[in-house]
């Protein structure tokens, strides 16, 4: 849809303010998309005359049409609260009630099931799946890894700007070292070829882009899993490679899960959940797993403990014990 000049100005302000406040690109795009949908639904009303009533009507329509789950509704509420507060300078969405999100038992895989799914993946996608399971990475964290974040000597990965803009360290599975070294070597060769043809740039964090404007050409800052095609960085106009798009990995994992024959839903996030479950079952305490997972709240980690307890994972049925004794 084509927005009015006024609406476009407010949307541009929203983008700028999200960047200034160091929101991730993913959150920025999501928030702006919700603001666009809201403005589109009330296109006949001038932006400066929109109120909380318009927001509640927008959310109610989407909810009654069955197109808005509680989690998405809360996301939309946060996005529109930011739009009103920061772009419009009005805080009338303060303390707007949130939808109650249902708590589901997380779907996890056994080690054998993980191997079945990984066995259906190949190349960089198998390596990505192995990192999500072996180090507990989120899909976005695995995609955003840069060459400098991998320490082969210490067997350590630095996760930069994870969820909540927090850095953390996770284990690098020794089993993945050879494959990761080969991937980095391919990235180095590709970067040299790109630089010879006028490319080779990797988008930098805002602060570094100002302090070291040429660092984006260095191998250390290249993405470990770059996109197959180069493009222009919208912030600098320089040609280079961004990281893989999430949809490409999600598509490959979905196909692999289907081919493996596992009768349960499997997504990229299932690898990470399975990591947490396996670590807890192995006897690691919840606080240690919380740090590895990058959970800001221990209660998030405890959902995995609860899932293990509720499902009786690791316990033995009295029928099995009796059978073994006999």
Language-model features: where?
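Conserved catalytic core of the tyrosine transesterase superfamily
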Residues: 1-326
């Amino acid at each position: 849809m084509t927005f009015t000049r006024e609406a476009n100005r407010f949307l541009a302000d929203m983008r700028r303010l999200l960047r200034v406040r160091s929101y991730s690109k993913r959150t920025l795009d999501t928030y702006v998309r919700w603001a666009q949908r809201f403005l589109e639904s009330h296109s006949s009303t001038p932006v400066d005359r929109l109120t909380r009533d318009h927001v509640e009507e927008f959310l109610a329509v989407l909810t009654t049409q069955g197109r808005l789950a509680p989690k998405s509704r809360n996301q939309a509420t946060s996005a529109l609260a930011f739009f009103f507060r920061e772009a419009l300078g009005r805080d009338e969405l303060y303390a707007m009630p949130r939808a109650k999100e249902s708590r589901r038992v997380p779907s996890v895989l056994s080690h054998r099931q993980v191997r079945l799914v990984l066995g259906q993946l190949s190349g960089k996608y198998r390596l990505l799946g192995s990192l999500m399971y072996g180090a507990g990475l989120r899909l976005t964290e695995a995609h955003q890894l840069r060459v400098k974040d991998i320490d082969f000597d210490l067997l350590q990965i630095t996760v930069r700007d994870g969820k909540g803009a927090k850095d953390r360290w996770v284990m690098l599975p020794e089993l993945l070292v050879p494959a990761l070294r080969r991937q980095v070597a391919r990235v180095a060769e590709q970067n040299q070829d790109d630089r010879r043809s006028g490319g080779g740039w990797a988008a930098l964090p805002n602060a570094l882009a100002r302090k070291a404007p040429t660092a984006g050409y260095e191998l250390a800052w290249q993405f470990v899993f770059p996109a197959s095609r180069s493009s222009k960085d919208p912030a600098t106009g320089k040609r280079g490679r961004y990281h893989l798009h999430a949809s490409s990995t999600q598509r490959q994992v979905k196909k692999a899960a289907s081919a493996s024959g596992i009768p349960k839903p499997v997504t990229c996030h299932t690898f990470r959940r399975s990591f947490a479950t396996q670590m807890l079952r192995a006897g690691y305490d919840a606080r240690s797993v919380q740090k590895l997972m990058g959970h800001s709240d221990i209660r998030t980690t405890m959902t995995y403990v609860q899932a293990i307890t509720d499902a009786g994972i690791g316990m033995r049925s009295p029928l099995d014990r009796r059978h073994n004794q006999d």
